[in-house]
From Swiss-Prot:
The keyword Kinase does not apply. This is Membrane protein YdfJ. Disulfide bonds: none annotated. It comes from the Bacteria. It comes from Bacillus subtilis (strain 168). It is found in: Cell membrane.
């Protein structure tokens, strides 16, 4: 592969305009087509074969309600000291309905004065507006007309909010906070390269690759079920790895230029060596992300595949676009000669010396720090974000709060129960009544509707309003209590609703995490054994990754679930940990951890093979690869941290997990714990049984064999004046 990439890098360097034009054409085509085709995201997070999904299937089969029609709920709130049942407020609401009904696409309006959907104190009410078309087909004009009509009620001092199938929700790809992350990444690159111009180039190439992947994901929504959070996740990961991968090739190119190698040859060698490591690292991340498909959860599979696509584009940009940009940059990439810096670099290696002199202290401190941070993960609670976890000024949150204020917290977490009396031994109507009575007797039940049977009378729907909100532990306990009543008197109870769905998703993900973790850890151990030809180094690396994950979950629980520092991170409300965050973080952080492990430890192995001196090998790795890993880690942290301050709760959670995960893994595990433990192991760190050494393949990750092959061909170039 190194030889092939060497050839590719050389060709791109010589045909830079063609390469850049090709990328521009692909970028314009992808974005243009994505804009032309209106994105159609699917927010369906259901999982096949779960109890809540089975309940929905029964409802659709046994309670057919005709064509699927879009419905929007309008919530009204009275002014201070007023009631909606008063004449002025009632007239304003009725006039509003008259104005709304002028839209021909409106099928019906369920007035609260007819249906009785008014709070006991008369301060809050809601009306369901049903349209003739499905939710996806509700026209922008209809939404505008609805909002304009509500201004009539607003002018009378009423509060109006919308919930339900409201199209046109803002799609978050990026924002001010993400731009701040890019700016901080730019600062890191400027310090690393000592040039503002060069610092901007890796960001430019990363953004081009990201633009293509975003366009492809948007196009993909026309064919596949992709959630909007998948787009943000793909953008987050694609940008971070795109900058990092470009950084590795930029650094290698400058190193070769500093050795006196001609420009195009230097680019070819940089792509052949660092590019090989980038391809290996990228494929590792892609495999980890695509591995999310093994859990057999549709929306998780979509997240993994879209994020994997963004990493693939980052890799392709690194080995085809970056060489073209380097060729255009020309002599500007040559590092400035500074004898003082060269002398310091040669004679000193502060961190490497410190680590090898204090391995016990650093090992113990690193492990203790990560264990302490991991403690909160012991009371991890999983769930899915609801409108109550959004910012208080968010329209969905305002609607959520207004309904909770009028009808109680549990109104937003209603449970829909499907009662199946097919096998009932008594009269089916009496069996349904008994089931309702049993449910009313449970703790924390605010209200229960009478059973509404289907035509045949063998199925019925019962709606339960809990006393607590959808993500409250008490509500989750109520779901389990209702399910435990199943089969009494021959009535089977299937529960659905947001809380029931959350429980089922959490249970399925909890079952999937051990399987996925075993696959990832096993894959990592085998992979690193092949790369480093050692047993103990991979073992320590995997153990370090496990500490990274527990610490990452610990900080997430500490902040997101327990509510510590939520004001600092601008998180509106504390709540359960995003149900898919643990397994998603395992996949992403595994790939990134292997990146840092390969870039750092492969340099150590190279030195150990030469000198057979483990201490010298550790110091060489930290000296030569440490600065690049440090810069790459900081860039990742800044980019991911920018998403903590995004608007969407799920994106905030992922941004927090990934930024702290990289912090723990890059700086505590890879730069401190791993070299410290390797110092304690000495030569044993590189032990590999002879029989195993003969079996496993010899993998050249960073293209060292390539350098040996082409060196005779380019020796004469080093004697010439650099031609740029």
């Amino acid at each position: 592969m190194s030889k092939m990439l060497y050839t590719l890098g050389g060709w791109v360097a010589r045909n830079r305009i063609k390469a850049i034009c090709a990328w521009i054409v692909v970028l314009v085509a992808a974005i243009g087509l994505a804009v032309t085709l209106k994105p159609s995201f699917s927010e369906d997070m259901s999982i096949p074969d779960t109890p809540s999904e089975k309940a929905m299937d029964v409802i659709q089969k046994e309670f057919p309600h005709g064509p699927d029609k879009g419905s929007i709920r309008v919530i009204f709130g009275a002014g201070d000291g007023e009631k909606l049942t008063g004449k002025p407020a009632k007239k304003a609401i009725e006039d509003t309905f008259k104005e709304i009904s002028k839209d021909d696409s409106v099928d019906s309006i369920a007035s609260p004065f007819v249906t009785g959907t008014i709070a006991k104190d008369g301060t809050v009410a809601y009306a369901d507006i049903q349209y003739k078309s499905s939710a996806d087909d509700i026209k922008d004009y209809s939404i505008k007309h609805l909002k304009d009509s509500l201004k009539m009620a607003d002018d009378e001092g009423l509060q109006t909010e919308l919930s339900g199938d409201v199209p046109g929700a803002e799609m978050e790809i990026g924002g001010v906070s993400e731009i701040v992350g890019i700016i901080l990444a730019f600062v890191v690159l400027a310090i690393t390269f000592g040039s503002l111009l060069i610092a901007g180039l890796p960001i430019l190439t990363a953004l081009i690759g990201l633009g293509v992947s975003i366009g492809l994901v948007l196009i993909g929504t026309q064919v596949f079920d992709i959630a909007s959070v998948s787009l943000s996740l793909a953008g987050m990961i694609g940008l971070a790895v795109g900058i990092d991968y470009a950084l590795f090739i930029f650094t290698k190119h400058r190193q070769f230029l500093g050795e006196g190698i001609q420009k195009n040859e230097s680019i070819a060698r940089a792509v052949g060596t660092a590019g090989s490591a980038v391809v290996f690292a990228g494929l590792t991340v892609i495999v980890a992300l695509c591995g999310l498909t093994v859990v057999n959860i549709p929306f998780m599979s979509a997240m993994g595949l879209t994020a994997g696509l963004s990493v693939l584009m980052a890799v392709l940009a690194s080995i085809t676009l970056v060489p073209a940009v380097l060729s255009i940059a020309g002599k500007r990439m040559i590092p400035k000669s500074n004898k003082k810096i060269e002398k310091q670099s040669t004679e000193t290696n502060v961190w490497g010396r410190f680590v090898t002199k204090n391995p016990i202290m650093l090992s113990v401190c690193s492990i203790l720090i990560l264990i302490v941070i991991s403690i909160p993960s012991m009371h991890l609670e999983l769930g899915l974000p609801d409108a109550g976890m959004k910012a208080k000024d968010n329209p969905d949150r305002r609607a959520y709060d207004l309904l909770a204020e009028g009808f109680g917290e549990g109104f937003n977490g209603q449970l829909t129960i499907v009662a199946d009396a097919t096998n009932a031994t008594e009269n089916k109507a009496e069996a349904f009544a008994d089931a309702v009575k049993e449910i009313k007797g449970l703790d924390h039940v605010a209200s229960v509707t009478p059973a509404m049977p289907n035509k045949e009378g063998n199925f019925a729907i019962i709606t339960v309003v809990p006393e607590t909100g959808p993500n409250d532990v008490t509500t989750k306990d109520l779901v389990h209590d209702v399910r435990s009543l199943s089969d009494k008197n021959g009535v089977d109870l299937l529960v659905t609703g947001s809380t029931a769905v959350n429980i089922d998703i959490s249970d399925r993900l909890n079952d999937a995490i051990p399987v996925f973790a075993v696959l990832i850890v096993g894959f990592a151990f085998v992979l690193l054994t092949i790369v480093f030809r050692s047993l103990l180094v991979p073992l320590v690396a995997v153990a370090g990754f496990m500490l990274t994950m527990t610490a990452t979950l610990g900080i997430c629980v500490f902040v997101l679930q327990d509510g510590n520092l939520i004001d600092f991170f601008k998180i509106p409300e504390k709540g359960p940990i995003l149900a898919f965050l643990p397994i998603l973080s395992i996949g992403i952080l595994f790939g990134l951890a292997m990146d840092y492990q390969v870039f750092l430890v492969s340099r150590m192995r190279e030195e150990y093979v030469k000198t057979n001196n483990p201490v010298q090998a550790i110091q060489a790795g930290l000296k030569h690869s440490g600065p690049v890993v440090t810069a790459a880690g900081l860039i990742m942290i800044f980019v991911f941290a920018g998403f903590i301050f995004a608007g969407e709760a799920s994106i905030k959670a992922n941004g927090l997990a990934l930024s702290f995960g990289v912090l723990f893994d890059a700086f505590i595990v890879r730069m401190t714990l791993i070299p410290s433990v390797m110092k304690l192991m000495g030569n044993a760190a590189w032990y590999l049984p002879k029989w195993l050494d003969k079996i496993i393949p010899n993998v050249d990750i960073e293209g060292h064999q390539l350098t040996k092959e082409i060196q005779p061909e380019i020796d004469h170039e080093q004697k010439k004046q650099i031609s740029v």
